[in-house]
């Protein structure tokens, strides 16, 4: 008798392709010299005006410390814990996190930052000492290795890099790869930082190094200046509006990778579009193929040896979490080899049931979303693709 969808999912060691570590308040102050740089080192302190803990760079208010700690919180986002200590300990405690993973049937989690890459543009805008910013990047990368070491085999750390300085980036690639990082978190819109666009050949030595080291490039939504939608319509509506539209930035990044010739020039380099969903991808690829054929690209650019959809199938992955029918349809249209599953834990709209969330537990959601798919497709999406991409032992 053929196994049911539920049986296949229950037998699969799920690799969650997008989760976040809520950075502890002393992450940087415990690793970067406050004797040398004082309060310029990122730190958390109470802000009387907003009545909450904030991350500060010097005297500049950057980010609510509890903003991303939405899992099991009792208020709808953008409301959030006012103090880190008020949030669920599984958001930031590595040992407690493993218990959460076991409860929800997740074998391993790929780890992304909150403040680590998303707010670095603030430092660049402050013209901070480059040595300080580099020290912060290294401190985060080292912290993540130490955090992951509490549960070997359960966490997949991804490095951040000082991308504004390519020489420093090349050095950090080697240092963090040797320490155990499995991929690179990279901004999708370099123009937000006053740097050349992704497709500019300025980045070619970075792509070449990542390709040689077999390190994937991971584009997480929001890793730049986040455009806000519907802000005049109310906090909760604006939050939903913005969260819905952020995938567009990653769609533009995929177009840059393909039309900009990056996939063509670096055929063994893998890319991941993170927290951006998958339902829209078949349309975008069909559109890219159509435009490719009907804009004379094949005739005028013989260097492109594949269609856009074929470059995607060879080198680009994307992740889904809440989708049901659109995820199943995308898998059926694209094939299962480049689709990953994520929960976005512990972000507010991730797959964590709670008093202010309609989410089901991950496996319960997957029973519906993947119902009827062949066993090899389910295993690809839940385990095999991520294991291959991040070079994990089975």
Task: Tell where the protein language model's regions lie, with residue ranges.
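Mid-to-C-terminal alpha-helical segments outside catalytic/metal-binding sites
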Residues: 2-13, 24-80, 85-88, 92-108, ...
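Catalytic pocket-lining loop regions of alpha/beta-barrel enzymes
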Residues: 3-5, 132-135, 148-156, 161, ...
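Conserved residues at the C-terminal ends of beta-strands
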Residues: 23, 112, 187
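Short aromatic-enriched loop/helix-cap "lid" or pocket-rim segments at secondary-structure transitions
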Residues: 26-29, 121-124, 229-232, 283-287, ...
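Surface-exposed, active-site-proximal loop segments in enzymatic domains
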Residues: 76-82, 117-132, 167
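Active-site mouth loops of central-metabolism enzymes
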Residues: 82-91, 127, 155-167
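Short glycine-enriched loops at secondary-structure junctions
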Residues: 112-117, 221-227, 347
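Short glycine/proline- and charge-enriched loop/turn segments
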Residues: 124-129, 233-243, 358-365
């Amino acid at each position: 008798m053929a196994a049911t969808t539920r049986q296949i999912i229950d037998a699969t060691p799920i690799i969650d392709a997008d989760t976040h570590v809520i950075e502890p308040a002393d992450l940087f102050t415990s690793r970067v010299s406050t004797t040398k740089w004082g309060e310029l080192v990122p730190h958390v302190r109470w802000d009387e005006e907003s009545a909450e803990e904030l991350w500060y760079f010097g005297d500049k208010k950057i980010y609510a410390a509890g903003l991303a700690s939405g899992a099991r919180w009792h208020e709808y986002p953008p409301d959030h814990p006012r103090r880190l200590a008020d949030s669920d300990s599984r958001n930031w405690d590595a040992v407690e996190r493993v218990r959460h993973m076991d409860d929800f049937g997740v074998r391993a989690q790929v780890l992304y930052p909150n403040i680590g890459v998303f707010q670095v543009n603030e430092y660049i805008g402050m013209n901070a000492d480059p040595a300080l910013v580099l020290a912060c990047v290294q401190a985060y990368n080292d912290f993540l290795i130490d955090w992951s070491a509490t549960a070997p085999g359960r966490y997949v750390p991804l490095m951040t890099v000082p991308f504004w300085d390519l020489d420093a980036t090349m050095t950090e690639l080697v240092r963090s790869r040797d320490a155990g990082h499995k991929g690179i978190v990279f901004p999708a819109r370099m123009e937000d930082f006053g740097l050349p666009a992704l497709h500019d050949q300025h980045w070619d030595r970075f792509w070449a190094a990542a390709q040689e080291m077999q390190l994937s490039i991971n584009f997480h939504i929001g890793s730049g200046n986040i455009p806000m939608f519907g802000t005049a319509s109310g906090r909760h509506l604006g939050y939903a509006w913005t969260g819905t539209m952020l995938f567009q930035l990653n769609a533009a990044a995929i177009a840059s990778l393909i039309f900009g010739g990056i996939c063509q020039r670096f055929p063994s380099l893998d890319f991941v579009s993170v927290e951006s969903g998958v339902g829209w991808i078949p349309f975008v690829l069909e559109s890219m193929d159509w435009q490719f054929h009907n804009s004379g690209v094949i005739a005028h650019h013989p260097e492109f040896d594949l269609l856009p959809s074929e470059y995607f199938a060879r080198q680009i992955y994307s992740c889904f979490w809440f989708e049901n029918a659109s995820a199943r349809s995308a898998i059926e249209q694209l094939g299962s080899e480049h689709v990953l599953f994520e929960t976005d834990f512990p972000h507010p709209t991730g797959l964590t049931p709670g008093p202010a969330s309609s989410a089901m537990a991950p496996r319960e959601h997957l029973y519906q979303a993947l119902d009827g798919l062949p066993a090899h497709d389910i295993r690809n999406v839940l385990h095999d693709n991520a294991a291959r991409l991040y070079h994990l032992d089975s």
